[in-house]
């Protein structure tokens, strides 16, 4: 017999987490637990404030309706629901059907923030392929350019992923590029969405020989994966994109065109983050995912991230907001 439960969680965040100028003091989300009478599986539904199109309240209503349809054995159209619900529910179904492999890729590209001198030491000590991520566009582009150039100059085997979140005008993007030595530009694996529009970003890449990646653009209406000069990758944030099936389709389209697909976090708890690491190992085995977000939390949820010492909140301690 099918059963279902929906839990609600609130996890405290590190004080330094800022999303589009809003401080995120706690992460709120839902956990859907499905059982077929033999197996039990879970998925996480956690719209990201300032980024998701839906609120937590809208996601909750959507999730309850979808769960009732599943219990009634109705045909499900997951991506007709809001993206965070489509992702969390599809992940629970994948787990229930034992289709998500257990092995995960926990080698996250570290997010560089804090003292550059400390970071240089940390990055020099990294083993294996050295890839790190830097958020740009928060300060003056000249400062960003100097910092990026410094890292590439001091660590000769480092590659960088940069993310500007569409934060620059064409002029500011040019100012940034002017401070990156031409010989280092090929070691920028990609710069996510440098300019306000995709057209400006494409022109920037052509003018500077700095590869770019689509992130927000992937979620624009009518987006299709296509070969475009300068575009090296697409970044897939399942909580913002939709069902696992939709994400896999985007990954396969990118791979067919010789592009990277990078599975990336939307600051989910350790429950969903470990599932994303497993999805990455399964579908993007050659690519380091963008999942270095567990240190933004003060607490984990249900499933522990490997080698993370943060305390783990148990589902049994959470509020059950709905069950059949």
Curated annotation (Swiss-Prot):
Its EC number is 4.2.1.113. It is an enzyme of class 4 (lyase). The keyword Signal does not apply. Pfam families: MenC_N (PF21508), MR_MLE_C (PF13378). SMART domains: MR_MLE. Its cofactor is a divalent metal cation. Mg(2+) binds at residues 163, 192, 215. The keyword Glycoprotein does not apply. GO terms for molecular function: magnesium ion binding; O-succinylbenzoate synthase activity. GO terms for biological process: menaquinone biosynthetic process. SUPFAM superfamilies: Enolase C-terminal domain-like (SSF51604), Enolase N-terminal domain-like (SSF54826). It catalyses: (1R,6R)-6-hydroxy-2-succinyl-cyclohexa-2,4-diene-1-carboxylate = 2-succinylbenzoate + H2O. Pathway: Quinol/quinone metabolism; 1,4-dihydroxy-2-naphthoate biosynthesis; 1,4-dihydroxy-2-naphthoate from chorismate: step 4/7; Quinol/quinone metabolism; menaquinone biosynthesis. Keywords: Lyase, Magnesium, Menaquinone biosynthesis, Metal-binding. The active site is at 135 (proton donor), 237 (proton acceptor). Belongs to the mandelate racemase/muconate lactonizing enzyme family. MenC type 1 subfamily. This is o-succinylbenzoate synthase. The gene is menC.
